[in-house]
Each structure stands twice: as structure tokens, then as C-alpha cells.
């Protein structure tokens, strides 16, 4: 074995325990990295790669970052999905003989970030854990370490359900056992793009048993235990801010899978991957960071409980009715800092004096917010006001102890107010009097020597000194001034009197700073006693902030309060797409009605490309979501059912599953909706069948419509270019044709974006191609071909009894020569039998993809 130096041996011993992390190894004022860590980090962080003697013939690769600026480099690594183990010197080098002892004091990973600079103010930073129970169910737990939130549930052991939970939470890190990680498919791991951490221990630490309630299932407790044990092992500090685990049921909220949320652009735009242009972007006028985080949670999980929805609507109504009080409320909320994350930093022990000032200033606002809510004389808002705990004793303590303009550092003094501690006042008086004496000494020495430029200064290396320019040194009396330091143009001296006073001043300052730090830590420890109360307060303030945001947005955008229907019917008069309207401007947007009930379950939408079919469909879904989060909706009138689920297949999703064709994605998403939808669900299907041959696509589209009509009875909006399908209105009682109107003016098509009853008479596809400025000769050729096709066209419609009303005499032409069929090989026969034996309706979309990969590998 290579004989490394003692320091490198120490590094390797520690690194062996943290193989999946970059080890930041403290050497003096730097964090150093060696070997593979150095090679990789130098490229990722764009820092210089050097070498260090380590006992080998060749230098060991090394790179490093300054200790005082390491946080920026750590943030970069974490943002890219890496982990960083912070290894500190845990002994004083001055008092230690030989090698200084070093230990990892914290493992920072994407899910355990606590530094404010590494967190997004209005986004949670979730870490989750998984426990698979006998392959039947997943115990699932998650936490935001920065806020102390801890929740858990039990979900079906399917990758689709797991993906939905992880993506709903925007999870940064998932803790699994080695066996659980192996079970999860590579497709899922790539799709999620999160950091996986392997951890086996799943017993709940003794000090955290109070966080778990008795009624929780075994799998749920194991998931919580795995999460808590991992956090304890990696963070190596008090986690007293973690709240009691709250059990939640996914069935208590409207369900939307990842693809539906992305298609509807609820919190992330498809193109920009940011908030701009999303429903969250539109509805977010929250004034606090914690309010912004709660708003995203509300949008991610719309309510299905009628009572809860109406309660939120009542609060929004009251806030809208009190305009001036709401303005006052907004001003108060602007001065409330992030109480959740402040409480987290207090528990972590990395809070500074400025954080405590922010806490104090936030608590000042609570009585004002409470008074404003009470002044509205609203029963619902009074209940909210009474939940606000001003923590008066804490406010008084912080006011008494901490100065208003405290420094960031907590070890250099200037934090504690005069009069708070008598001993501190004594030290400060000694220091201040000494400094007054210093100022007087400078005046006397100038008079004595006649040197007007003489000054008394101080630095940490040499202490106090008298500085005289070299040109004036001859004026100094002999024997009284002792030279202390020589500069280029001056000399620095000390006198016996100055030396004596210096000791008194510096002793007083040192003792003062030590006592200040002690007093500050006492205040900080006292704040820990209020963490639970602060977390409850933060939740109440966040809720108020979300409700005022709904009121503000509803008023500014002319939203109205929807009525919740009892019979499942949907009637929207002059509805608008809230986001498109905001981007375009209210004057430009064309509003439309939408009506769905028991006799009108499916709307079959036809009309030209670019006419607004997809926008209309999204508009209906977003209106429902707005209503079920408790907000008002963009319409003149609205009566809405409470949807239990929303399923969408609306364009722009072809890239969602790596390696899958458009048609495969269509079929997977269609299957997901058809199998899981109920009569209380909403289905949006845009151009189903477009990814395959015309007759194949049309046949599938018709079969899907019929299946939904006969078996599912979900409210459905189905857009299509297959105009033959409009004849289904004659066969299916619950289907109604509607179309997006367009007119021709002077040979040009004008899209009116208006929904009308009945089918569209033309598709205007060639006009759209003309708008795209395809070559004129190509457009003319397409027009001639269209005329020929239309003259030979016969409609095909297969009725429910499977008897064709009219069947085209010619089959669809192939683009390629048709080869005579050959007898299938034994290998192909086996594959065909395997495919025939598959129960497609019992497969999840993810199961279907994995099976397809398996079949492909057998072919190749």
C-alpha cells in the first residue's frame, strides 16, 4: 500500500465514510479537496487544479476554496445535485501536538440546505423517504428542513403514484434502501432528476418518538424513521424545530398527475421552465415568503371538501369587501419576515443578531394584523385573527436585549444594548473612557511636540501606537518614545503611559466581546422555547397572506365567486383563460361559455389549427382549479362541480418520457385517464390519434370517446381534426359538437376564437400553412390535392352496434410498397403470444413503458 503522509491518511480515512460527497477538508483558511474530488470539483467550480506532496512520487491532485467564501461554491455543487461533507478542525492547532483532529460536522445535500442563499424564498426544499412494505404499499414521508415541516402518507406501490407525489412536492432528494433503489426503474430515476441517497436504518430515534402518532401504519413509521435517522446522522445537530408528523391522504385533494400539471402550466411553464406565464405566477400577490410557499402548496393540491372551499371563498369575499383595510393588511404583511425559516435557523444555532431583529420587527406587526382583521367585523376573519399569537414576552425580550443596527458577526460585539447587563456596561465604560483618554493623549502629544500630523492609531497586530512622519521624527524628545514599527514614510512609537492604558482598554474590550457573545447565546436559547409557537404563527400569517392575494387578484382581474353545483353540472358564462388574458390584455381576449351536465358529458371540439381549441380546454380546467383552491374565477357567471381528478393530453408533451414516440405518450396518457377517471373527473383530450396513420387514429379516437361515454361518464372535452367523428353526436346521447368559428375574408382566414354549437365546416389547414409562409407553389399544389380528395371522399362512421353505415371502397394507401406477408418465425410467435397474454388494463403507464423496453430488447 502507498505510504501517504499522516495528513493524507487522515483525509482518506474520512473520505472513505463519505464516498458519495465532495469532502471539504479544512486546512487553515481553506477547504481543500484531493484525488478524484479535486479533479471533478476543479471542472465543475472552474477553479485551479494544483498538486500537493503526499508521500507518493507524483503530486496528489488538489484544489481548494477560501473558507470565508466557501458557501458560494457549496451552493453551486448542491444546485447541480451533488453532496458536500464539511470537515472541520475540532482541536485548536495552537494547543495540539501532532496531527489536528478533524471530523465531518455536517453533510449538505440538495434536500438539507439551510443557508438562506441556497434556498428560493417562495419554494419549499423537500427531502423525502420511502419504505416499501411487502411490495404492496409505500410508506412515504417528507420534510422541509428549513421550515420544520414533516408529513407522511401511505400510497400504492406503483411508480406512477410515487412520481406524482415526488413531482407534486418538487422533491430535491429521496432516501431509499439499496434494495428499494434497485427496484426503481432507470427511466424513473432519469425522469425525476433528483438526488438519491441510500440509507438502511429506519427506526425512529428515541429523541424524535414524540413526532410520530400512535395511529400511523408500520410502513409510514418506517419511512419517517428512515428520514429522521438520515437527518440526525448527516446534520449532527439539534433538530428540535421539526414539527410533529402530520398524516395526509392524497384522496382528500384533487388528483392531477405530473403530465396534467405540466400541460396546464400550474407552477412551471413548459417552455421557460419558470413561473412566468403559469397559474401560480398569476395568483401570487403574497407579501411574505412563507405565504408564497403555502400558495404553491394550495395550487398543487386543490381541495375537494365543499366546506373547506366555501370557507376560503367566504374569507376572500370579506377581504374584497374591505378595500382600505386590505391595503393596510398588505402593508403590515410586507414587514413580516420568513418566520418559518427564522425558527429553523434558531434551532440550528446559526441565527445571527440581524435575524433576531427581523424576528422582533415581524412580531411588531402581529397585533396590527390582528386589529385590522377584527376591524372588518367578519366572523370568518375574526376566527383567523384569534389564531395570531403575538408572543409578547419574546418581543419584549428582543427589544430589551438587541440593538437596532446589529452587525452580522456575533463574536465582535456591538449586539447587546446598553443597560441590559451591568457587568457589560462596566466593561464598556472602561473601554470608552480609555478611548476618550486616547483621543486626549493625541491632542496633548501634538501640543508637546509641535507635530500637527501626529496621530494615535490601532491595529490588531501591534495594538495602539503613535505615528509620526519620517520628516518630523527629529522633533520627538529623546528617551520617551519607543520605536514599535517602521513604515516607508513614517515611524510608529509607543510610550509607557500608552502601553499601560492599552492593556486596560484591550482587556475590557476582550471581556466585553466574550460577555456579549454569552448574552447573545442566552437570548438565542430563549428564542428556541418559542419555536413551536412561531411555527403556528407562521402558518396563520401564511394563510392570511394567501387569502389576501386571492382577493387582490380577483378584484384586479374581475373574477367572480363561483357557485358549487350539487348535481355535477358545469355552467360557465363568458369564461376566460386567466393567464392568457393577463398576457394579452382583457380587451383582446375573447370569452366563451361552457356547459356540461348529465345529458351533455362530452364536448367534441372541431375547428382550425391556431383557433384556440387547446386554450379553451385549458381554460375550463384552470377555472375549476381556481375554484377548488378557494379563489374566485375568470367569468361573468360560474357554477362548477367539485372535480376529484383532472386528466389532460394537450400537445407539447412529446418530450415528457425519454425515448417515447408521440403516439406512445398519447396512448399511455389516454389509458391513465380512462382507467382512473370517475364520473366526478374532468378529462381533456387534444387531438388523440394524431401520432399514427389516419384511419388508425380515427378508429382509436372514436373508440376512446365511446368508452368514456358508456363506462366512465367523466366530463370530457375532446378536440379533433377527424371531422368524421362529428357524426357521433347522432349515436351518443351525451355527446355534443361545438366548434371554434372562423371566417374567410378576401381569401384569407380570420380566426374569431369564439365557441359555437355544432361541428366546424372546414379545417382551414391550408390557410394556416399559408400564414406560416410556405412557398406559394406548395400551397397551390396542396389546394388542388385537397379538391381531389374531397371529391372522392366518403364518410366512415361505425355505429355502436358495430354495423358500418358506409364504408369506403378503398383501403388507406401505404406510402411504401407492401411486401407479401411471410410466416412468422418462432421468435416472433413467442413475442406475439407474450403480447397477447399481457393485461394492458391492469398496467400503469410506467409498467407499460418498462414492458415495451423489455420486448424491444428481445427483438434486438
Curated annotation (Swiss-Prot):
GO biological process: mismatch repair
Record-linked InterPro entries: DNA_mismatch_repair_MutS, DNA_mismatch_repair_MutS-lik_N, DNA_mismatch_repair_MutS/MSH, DNA_mismatch_repair_MutS_C, DNA_mismatch_repair_MutS_clamp, DNA_mismatch_repair_MutS_core, DNA_mismatch_repair_MutS_N, DNA_mismatch_repair_MutS_sf
UniProt entry tagged with the keyword Aminoacyl-tRNA synthetase: no
Pfam families for this protein: MutS_I, MutS_II, MutS_III, MutS_IV, MutS_V
Gene3D superfamilies listed in its UniProt record: 1.10.1420.10, DNA repair protein MutS, domain I (3.40.1170.10), MutS, connector domain (3.30.420.110), P-loop containing nucleotide triphosphate hydrolases (3.40.50.300)
A GO cellular-component term linked to this record: cytosol
Annotated S-S bridges: none
A Gene Ontology molecular function term of the record: damaged DNA binding
Binding site residues for ATP: 607-614
Keywords (A to Z) from UniProt: ATP-binding, DNA damage, DNA repair, DNA-binding, Nucleotide-binding
Family, as annotated: Belongs to the DNA mismatch repair MutS family.
Role, per record: This protein is involved in the repair of mismatches in DNA. It is possible that it carries out the mismatch recognition step. This protein has a weak ATPase activity.
The protein, known as: DNA mismatch repair protein MutS
Biological source species: Listeria innocua serovar 6a (strain ATCC BAA-680 / CLIP 11262)
Gene: mutS
Amino acid at each position: 500500500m502507498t505510504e501517504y503522509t499522516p495528513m493524507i491518511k487522515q483525509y482518506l480515512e474520512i473520505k472513505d465514510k463519505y464516498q458519495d460527497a465532495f469532502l471539504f477538508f479544512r486546512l487553515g483558511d481553506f477547504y481543500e479537496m484531493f484525488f478524484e474530488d479535486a479533479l471533478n470539483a476543479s471542472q465543475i467550480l472552474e477553479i485551479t487544479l494544483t498538486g500537493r506532496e503526499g508521500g507518493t512520487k507524483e503530486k496528489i491532485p488538489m484544489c481548494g476554496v477560501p473558507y470565508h467564501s466557501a458557501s458560494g461554491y457549496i451552493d453551486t455543487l448542491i444546485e447541480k445535485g451533488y453532496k458536500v461533507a464539511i470537515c472541520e478542525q475540532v482541536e485548536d492547532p495552537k494547543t495540539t501536538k501532532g496531527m489536528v483532529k478533524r471530523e465531518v460536522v455536517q453533510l449538505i445535500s440538495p434536500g438539507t440546505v439551510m443557508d438562506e442563499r441556497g434556498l428560493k424564498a417562495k419554494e419549499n426544499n423537500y427531502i423525502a423517504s420511502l419504505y416499501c412494505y411487502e411490495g404492496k404499499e409505500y410508506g412515504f414521508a417528507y420534510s422541509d428542513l428549513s421550515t420544520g415541516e414533516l408529513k407522511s402518507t401511505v400510497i400504492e406501490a406503483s411508480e406512477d403514484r410515487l412520481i406524482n407525489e415526488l413531482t407534486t412536492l418538487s422533491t430535491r432528494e429521496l432516501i431509499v434502501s439499496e434494495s428499494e433503489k434497485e427496484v426503481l426503474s432507470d427511466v424513473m430515476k432519469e425522469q425525476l432528476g433528483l438526488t438519491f441517497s441510500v440509507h438502511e436504518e429506519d427506526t425512529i430515534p428515541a429523541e424524535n418518538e414524540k413526532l410520530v402518532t400512535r395511529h400511523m401504519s408500520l410502513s409510514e413509521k418506517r419511512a419517517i424513521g428512515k428520514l429522521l435517522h438520515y437527518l440526525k446522522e448527516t446534520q449532527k445537530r439539534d433538530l428540535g424545530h421539526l414539527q410533529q408528523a402530520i398524516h395526509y391522504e392524497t384522496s382528500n385533494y384533487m388528483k392531477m398527475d405530473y403530465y396534467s400539471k405540466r400541460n396546464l402550466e400550474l407552477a412551471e411553464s413548459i417552455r421557460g421552465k419558470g413561473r412566468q406565464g403559469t397559474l401560480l405566477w398569476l395568483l401570487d400577490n403574497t407579501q411574505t415568503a412563507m405565504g408564497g410557499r403555502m400558495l404553491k402548496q394550495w395550487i398543487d393540491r386543490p381541495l375537494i371538501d365543499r366546506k373547506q372551499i366555501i370557507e376560503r371563498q367566504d374569507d376572500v369575499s370579506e377581504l374584497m369587501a374591505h378595500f382600505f383595510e386590505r391595503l393596510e393588511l398588505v402593508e403590515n404583511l410586507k414587514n413580516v419576515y420568513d418566520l418559518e425559516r427564522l425558527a429553523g435557523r434558531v434551532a440550528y444555532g446559526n441565527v445571527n443578531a440581524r435575524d433576531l431583529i427581523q424576528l422582533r420587527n415581524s412580531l411588531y406587526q402581529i397585533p396590527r394584523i390582528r386589529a385590522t382583521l377584527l376591524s372588518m367585523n367578519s366572523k370568518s376573519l375574526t376566527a383567523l385573527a384569534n389564531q395570531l399569537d403575538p408572543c409578547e414576552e419574546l418581543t419584549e425580550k428582543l427589544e430589551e436585549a438587541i440593538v437596532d443596527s446589529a452587525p452580522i458577526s456575533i463574536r465582535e460585539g456591538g449586539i447587546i444594548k446598553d443597560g441590559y447587563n451591568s457587568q457589560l456596561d462596566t466593561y464598556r465604560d472602561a473601554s470608552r473612557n480609555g478611548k476618550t483618554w486616547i483621543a486626549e493623549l493625541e491632542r496633548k502629544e501634538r501640543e508637546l511636540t509641535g507635530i500637527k500630523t501626529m496621530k494615535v492609531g490601532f491595529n490588531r497586530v501591534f495594538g495602539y501606537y503613535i505615528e509620526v512622519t519620517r520628516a518630523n521624527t527629529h522633533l520627538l524628545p529623546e528617551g520617551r518614545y519607543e520605536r514599535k514599527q517602521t513604515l516607508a514614510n513614517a515611524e510608529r512609537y509607543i510610550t509607557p503611559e500608552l502601553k499601560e492604558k492599552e492593556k486596560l482598554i484591550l482587556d475590557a474590550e476582550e471581556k466585553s466581546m466574550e460577555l456579549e457573545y454569552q448574552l447573545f447565546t442566552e437570548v438565542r436559547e430563549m428564542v428556541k422555547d418559542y419555536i413551536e409557537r412561531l411555527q403556528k404563527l407562521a402558518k396563520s400569517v401564511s394563510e392570511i397572506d394567501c387569502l389576501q392575494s386571492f382577493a387582490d387578484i380577483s378584484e384586479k382581474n374581475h373574477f367572480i365567486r363561483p357557485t358549487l353545483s350539487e348535481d355535477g353540472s358545469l355552467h360557465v358564462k363568458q369564461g376566460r383563460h386567466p393567464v392568457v388574458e393577463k398576457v394579452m390584455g382583457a380587451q383582446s381576449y375573447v370569452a366563451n361559455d361552457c356547459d356540461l351536465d348529465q345529458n351533455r358529458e362530452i364536448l367534441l371540439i372541431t375547428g382550425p389549427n391556431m383557433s384556440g381549441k387547446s386554450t379553451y380546454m385549458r381554460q375550463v380546467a384552470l377555472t375549476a382549479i381556481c375554484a377548488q383552491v378557494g379563489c374566485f374565477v375568470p367569468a361573468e357567471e360560474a357554477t362548477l362541480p367539485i372535480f376529484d381528478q383532472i386528466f389532460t393530453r394537450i400537445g407539447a408533451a412529446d418530450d415528457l418520457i425519454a425515448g417515447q414516440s408521440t403516439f406512445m405518450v398519447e396512448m399511455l396518457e389516454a389509458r391513465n385517464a380512462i382507467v382512473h377517471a370517475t364520473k366526478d373527473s374532468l378529462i381533456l383530450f387534444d387531438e388523440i390519434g394524431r401520432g399514427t396513420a389516419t384511419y388508425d387514429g380515427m378508429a382509436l379516437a372514436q373508440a376512446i370517446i365511446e368508452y368514456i361515454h358508456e363506462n366512465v361518464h367523466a366530463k370530457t372535452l375532446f378536440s379533433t381534426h377527424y371531422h368524421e367523428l362529428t357524426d357521433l353526436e347522432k349515436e351518443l346521447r351525451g355527446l355534443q359538437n361545438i366548434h371554434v368559428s372562423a371566417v374567410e375574408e378576401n381569401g384569407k382566414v380570420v380566426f374569431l376564437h369564439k365557441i359555437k354549437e355544432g361541428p366546424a365546416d372546414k379545417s382551414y389547414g391550408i390557410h394556416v400553412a399559408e400564414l406560416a409562409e410556405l412557398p406559394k407553389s406548395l400551397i397551390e399544389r396542396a389546394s388542388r390535392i385537397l379538391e381531389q380528395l374531397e371529391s372522392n371522399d366518403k364518410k366512415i362512421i361505425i355505429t355502436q352496434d358495430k354495423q358500418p353505415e358506409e364504408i369506403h371502397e378503398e383501403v388507406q394507401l401505404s406510402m411504401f410498397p407492401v411486401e407479401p406477408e411471410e410466416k412468422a418465425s418462432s421468435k416472433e410467435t413467442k413475442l406475439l403470444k407474450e403480447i397477447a397474454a399481457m393485461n394492458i388494463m391492469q398496467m400503469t403507464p410506467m409498467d407499460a413503458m418498462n414492458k415495451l423496453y423489455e420486448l424491444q430488447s428481445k427483438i434486438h
